[in-house]
Amino acid sequence: MAMGSGGAGSEQEDTVLFRRGTGQSDDSDIWDDTALIKAYDKAVASFKHALKNGDICETPDKPKGTARRKPAKKNKSQKKNATTPLKQWKVGDKCSAVWSEDGCIYPATITSIDFKRETCVVVYTGYGNREEQNLSDLLSPTCEVANSTEQNTQENESQVSTDDSEHSSRSLRSKAHSKSKAAPWTSFLPPPPPMPGSGLGPGKPGLKFNGPPPPPPLPPPPFLPCWMPPFPSGPPIIPPPPPISPDCLDDTDALGSMLISWYMSGYHTGYYMGFRQNKKEGKCSHTN
């Protein structure tokens, strides 16, 4: 900071504001900043005094004329629009107006004009809604046609993307369905345990998932050796999940599929733990 006089600067240079390690306290981070505050106040006072006497000229932080360039351009555009003559609207003219509810452009017809307030009342074609609009805000009917064409193009693009995604999802479901038919239940794995309340025992045919199953149960207790079927040396083949029908596209069916996957995950986890325990008990019986 520039100082007003040389004497003040030399006096401040001789003043020691802070020296670490000279305090009596062991904590060197706690120190008195009174001298620093006094030096700052003194420097500010001397600068203000020199500025008041005219020794120092205050220079602005920003150059003049640079901060208002953009508003100047805006004013030019406003002047240009003001110089261009507005269209002389009449009662009964067709126009396009922006509806205040959604901000979209709709075709309308002028029903009344207030030249003093430069406003008018328009009726939207095909809707019958009335709304007051400024005469300067009215658009030609061709603007509405261009806007509707652009909206139709965007809707068509979104529809095409939606159709592509649906086609890809259906193809994936058909592939999963064909794979599930090609890989039926094998003798390496027993069928999943019955659902609560179904009345079907393990190994009985006709196990179906008619509705969303309950949350996945806890892993089953340790399996008995008599319950475990013989296992081959290779790893078991895990059956695929039940195929999802193409007509089941609501959230209820998606929730049911998720709960089924949880149920199957808990079943296979308990099945693996029982297999390990059965194998461990078999080793212990051989050693004994």
Curated annotation (Swiss-Prot):
Homooligomer; may form higher order homooligomers in the dimer to octamer range. Part of the core SMN complex that contains SMN1, GEMIN2/SIP1, DDX20/GEMIN3, GEMIN4, GEMIN5, GEMIN6, GEMIN7, GEMIN8 and STRAP/UNRIP. Part of the SMN-Sm complex that contains SMN1, GEMIN2/SIP1, DDX20/GEMIN3, GEMIN4, GEMIN5, GEMIN6, GEMIN7, GEMIN8, STRAP/UNRIP and the Sm proteins SNRPB, SNRPD1, SNRPD2, SNRPD3, SNRPE, SNRPF and SNRPG. Component of an import snRNP complex composed of KPNB1, RNUT1, SMN1 and ZNF259. Residues 88-148 form the Tudor domain. Belongs to the SMN family. Changing residue 267 to C: Loss of interaction with SYNCRIP. Residues 1-29, 54-85, 146-216 are annotated as: Disordered. Pfam families: SMN_G2-BD, SMN_Tudor, SMN_YG-box. Residues 274-288 are annotated as: Required for interaction with SYNCRIP. Expressed in motor neurons. It comes from Mus musculus (Mouse). Changing residue 257 to I: Loss of interaction with SYNCRIP. Residues 65-79, 170-180 have a biased composition (Basic residues). GO terms for biological process: axonogenesis; DNA-templated transcription termination; microtubule depolymerization; positive regulation of RNA splicing; regulation of neuron projection development; spliceosomal snRNP assembly. It is found in: Nucleus, Gem; Nucleus, Cajal body; Cytoplasm; Cytoplasmic granule. CDD domains: SMN_C, SMN_N, Tudor_SMN. Residues 94-204 are annotated as: Required for interaction with RPP20/POP7. This is Survival motor neuron protein. The SMN complex catalyzes the assembly of small nuclear ribonucleoproteins (snRNPs), the building blocks of the spliceosome, and thereby plays an important role in the splicing of cellular pre-mRNAs. Most spliceosomal snRNPs contain a common set of Sm proteins SNRPB, SNRPD1, SNRPD2, SNRPD3, SNRPE, SNRPF and SNRPG that assemble in a heptameric protein ring on the Sm site of the small nuclear RNA to form the core snRNP (Sm core). Residues 10-41 are annotated as: P1 (binding site for GEMIN2). GO terms for molecular function: RNA binding. The Tudor domain mediates association with dimethylarginines, which are common in snRNP proteins.
